[in-house]
Amino acid sequence: MTSQRTRERLIQRLCEEGISNQRVLDVIRKTPRHLFVDEALAHRAYEDTALPIGHNQTISQPYMVARMSELLLAAGPLDKVMEIGTGSGYQTAVLAQLVERVFSVERIKVLQDRAKERLVELNLRNVVFRWGDGWEGWPALAPYNGIIVTAVATDVPQALLDQLAPGGRLVIPVGSGEVQQLMLIIREENGFSRHVLGAVRFVPLLNGPIA
């Protein structure tokens, strides 16, 4: 089911779970999540759950997409955001409607190619892609006002901290196995402030691109 009623049910659940940024909710409401999953799973697209997309990867739970987007935007509008882990392209599509420019890095080429096609279909033209290692970020185009990481890192990659602009916000899951925490890191005048925001579950952030 991909009816408007099904989408509204998801939005209601996100509100009940504490998502309050109206722009984020509006974008989640109008973004067709069923286009980002296999046809066989389309009937589950508006459930608040992660779903497999192949290559041992998942499309993130809508609540987590909303939560991470809300955290990124909490200090105001952003003009330049880097996403680590394009995956299906769903989080990318949401970001593209919330910020001025998105720079998305993915290590699995076939996933990135599919994501590109979906964003073209949705006429989202403010995203550029890099096929590469997410641990390295995209230093050539740094700094970024915001960075969002859609896979869990064993530690915060120094390269990503280095690419964060002053006042910039990094939203990243950190940990391993079943012990993972969502973190918000802000680049302050004299270093970084770190905020632990609760337990999460993500696939691991791996090294090295795969064709």
Swiss-Prot record:
UniProt keyword terms in alphabetical order: Cytoplasm, Methyltransferase, S-adenosyl-L-methionine, Transferase
Molecular-function GO terms, alphabetical: protein-L-isoaspartate (D-aspartate) O-methyltransferase activity
GO biological process: methylation; protein modification process; protein repair
GO-annotated cellular components: cytoplasm
Class of enzymatic activity (EC top level): transferase
Signal peptide: none
Key word Transmembrane present: no
Subcellular localization, as worded in the UniProt entry: Cytoplasm
Highest taxon of the lineage: Bacteria
InterPro entries: PCMT (IPR000682), SAM-dependent_MTases_sf (IPR029063)
EC number: 2.1.1.77
Record-annotated active site: 60
Catalyses which reaction(s): [protein]-L-isoaspartate + S-adenosyl-L-methionine = [protein]-L-isoaspartate alpha-methyl ester + S-adenosyl-L-homocysteine
SUPFAM superfamilies: S-adenosyl-L-methionine-dependent methyltransferases (SSF53335)
Family of this protein: Belongs to the methyltransferase superfamily. L-isoaspartyl/D-aspartyl protein methyltransferase family.
Function according to Swiss-Prot or TrEMBL: Catalyzes the methyl esterification of L-isoaspartyl residues in peptides and proteins that result from spontaneous decomposition of normal L-aspartyl and L-asparaginyl residues. It plays a role in the repair and/or degradation of damaged proteins.
UniProt name for this protein: Protein-L-isoaspartate O-methyltransferase
Organism field: Pseudomonas savastanoi pv. phaseolicola (strain 1448A / Race 6)
